[in-house]
Regions:
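Short acidic-glycine-tyrosine-enriched beta hairpin
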Residues: 73-93
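A short, N-terminal "cap"/entry segment at the start of jelly-roll beta-barrel domains
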Residues: 1-38
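Conserved short histidine dyad/triad with adjacent acidic residue
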Residues: 28-58, 88-92
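Long, charge-rich low-complexity segments
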Residues: 4-7, 108-117
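Glycine- and acidic-residue-biased ligand/ion/polar-headgroup-sensing regions
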Residues: 49, 58-74
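Ligand-binding loop in jelly-roll beta-barrel domains
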Residues: 89-113
């Protein structure tokens, strides 16, 4: 018997991205295996044009693959379609998408909004 979950990321139901308690404007997600208590797992994140992530600190690794679009990180670095990005534990940032983006996110630990620190 195989325990697996196969999804078509272009044909899933997205829900408002509410990871920090209330929905973040212009962002939605589809949880694949993400556990909101431990911060472990993966999800598909959709950022509409103009979306801005909440500035946050990584407690564990956060890695993502950009399927479509691009992100501009808080330090000005641009992440483009086809790139895989890895943030180490303790790193802090936020990202903005001018044109929108579809991203597969892999997290190994919770993120905390910067205002909590």
């Amino acid at each position: 018997m195989h325990d697996r979950n196969i999804i078509d990321i272009h044909n899933v139901e997205f829900k408002p991205f509410d990871r920090y308690g209330s929905p973040v404007p212009n962002m939605s997600w589809h949880i694949i295996s993400y556990d909101q208590i431990s911060g472990q797992g993966s999800y598909v994140l959709k950022m509409d044009p103009g979306a801005q992530t909440v500035p946050h600190t990584h407690m564990g690794f956060e890695e993502f693959f950009i399927v479509e679009g691009e992100l501009i990180d808080s330090d000005g670095m641009v992440f483009k379609k086809g790139e895989f990005v890895s943030f180490e534990p303790g790193s802090q940032h936020s990202s903005f998408s001018e044109i929108g983006a579809l991203i597969i996110v892999f997290q190994r630990g919770l993120n905390h909004p910067l205002e909590e620190h």
